[in-house]
Every structure is written in structure tokens, then in C-alpha cells.
Amino acid sequence: MDIDPYKEFGASVELLSFLPSDFFPSVRDLLDTASALYRDALESPEHCTPNHTALRQAILCWGELMTLASWVGNNLEDPAARDLVVNYVNTNMGLKIRQLLWFHISCLTFGRETVLEYLVSFGVWIRTPPAYRPPNAPILSTLPETTVVRRRGRSPRRRTPSPRRRRSQSPRRRRSQSPASQC
């Protein structure tokens, strides 16, 4: 199976591959950032956004991978084989997790469209020969819009009418469904 974890978010593994591996912060830094910014939403039993869900999954996968790495470290006798496994996990799996964490944290912080625009512009920049491109790579805005996570469900009723509503307007009434149309 060819599963791309970024597909439903409008990106792709290929699009993220334009960013060099040293671009992504360490897993520890990314986990600290996710915890500092989104702990309440990540620990909430309620669904927030697909990015929150994907971030939760990436964090859980990293935890499972660390459990496996600890088991290998404790049970693999051959130091050379142990080093090979640890290096493989850090190099390959670590990079994939860092990319996933960075992508979803960035989408929550800056907005998905901004992150996608950044990835495309960086991809164009990096593929342009040095003689024809600006000296500095594009940067993801350091002044993000405020991210608001709204819970699903009904909003609390207002006790007073909105100041924008004229008194002469009557509030809209909901149409009642006929019993035949209900399931």
C-alpha cells in the first residue's frame, strides 16, 4: 500500500521532502511545543480538528517506537546490531516523526493554507538554480494568526440581542420537520 499521511491535508511526502532533514527540530523540542501550545486540545476526549487527531497519532507512534527501541536496547546482545537498529530508527523513523509533528503543529499554529503555500514556495526556491534564486529561502511567518479551537456543539444562548440587530427585525424561526421526514 502506498499511504501518504499528508494527503488529506493537501500536502504530500514529496512536498515535505524538499525541506532538508536538519530543518526539522528535534522530536523532544516538537513534543514540548505541542504540549505547551495544544495540551488541552490533545488531551481532550472531544474531537477538535483532523490536525489534532493526526498530532495525537504521531505522538502515540513515537511513544510506541521508543518502547520498541528500549526493548531492543535491553534484549539485543550484539552491540553492533543494537547500534544499527538505533541508528536506523533515529535516521529514518525519527525523521518521519519529526516531519509529521512539524507539519501538524505548523498547520495548527499558522493555518494549513499558509503551511502549504510555504512548502510550495520553498520547493520552488530549492529547485531553482542558485544563480537565479534569491539568496534567502522563504520563511514561514513568525507572526501567526491567532488559532482558535472551537468545540463542536451548540453555542450558549445570548441573553441580550446583538447590538447590530434592529429591534424591528423578528428573529428567524426554525422550520419544524414533519414526522414523515424524521428517521
Curated annotation (Swiss-Prot):
Keyword vocabulary terms for this entry: Capsid protein, Cytoplasmic inwards viral transport, DNA-binding, Host cytoplasm, Host-virus interaction, Microtubular inwards viral transport, Phosphoprotein, Repeat, RNA-binding, T=4 icosahedral capsid protein, Viral penetration into host nucleus, Virion, Virus entry into host cell
GO biological process: microtubule-dependent intracellular transport of viral material towards nucleus; symbiont entry into host cell; viral penetration into host nucleus
A molecular-function term among this protein's GO annotations: structural molecule activity
Compartments, as annotated in UniProt: Virion; Host cytoplasm
Region ranges (RNA binding): 177-183
Pfam families: Hepatitis_core
PTMs per UniProt: Phosphorylated by host SRPK1, SRPK2, and maybe protein kinase C or GAPDH. Phosphorylation is critical for pregenomic RNA packaging. Protein kinase C phosphorylation is stimulated by HBx protein and may play a role in transport of the viral genome to the nucleus at the late step during the viral replication cycle.
Superkingdom assignment: Viruses
Bias type Basic residues, positions: 149-176
Motif (Bipartite nuclear localization signal): 158-175
Stretches forming Sequence repeats: 155-161, 162-169, 170-177
GO annotations of cellular component type: host cell; host cell cytoplasm; T=4 icosahedral viral capsid
Statement: the UniProt record of this protein carries the keyword Iron: no
Positions where Phosphoserine occurs in the chain: 155, 162, 170
Region (3 X 8 AA repeats of S-P-R-R-R-[PR]-S-Q) location: 155-177
Region (Disordered) location: 136-183
TM annotation in the entry: none
Subunit-structure text: Homodimerizes, then multimerizes. Interacts with cytosol exposed regions of viral L glycoprotein present in the reticulum-to-Golgi compartment. Interacts with human FLNB. Phosphorylated form interacts with host importin alpha; this interaction depends on the exposure of the NLS, which itself depends upon genome maturation and/or phosphorylation of the capsid protein. Interacts with host NUP153.
The protein's role, per its UniProt record: Self assembles to form an icosahedral capsid. Most capsids appear to be large particles with an icosahedral symmetry of T=4 and consist of 240 copies of capsid protein, though a fraction forms smaller T=3 particles consisting of 180 capsid proteins. Entering capsids are transported along microtubules to the nucleus. Phosphorylation of the capsid is thought to induce exposure of nuclear localization signal in the C-terminal portion of the capsid protein that allows binding to the nuclear pore complex via the importin (karyopherin-) alpha and beta.
Name of this chain's protein: Capsid protein
Species lineage: Viruses, Riboviria, Pararnavirae, Artverviricota, Revtraviricetes
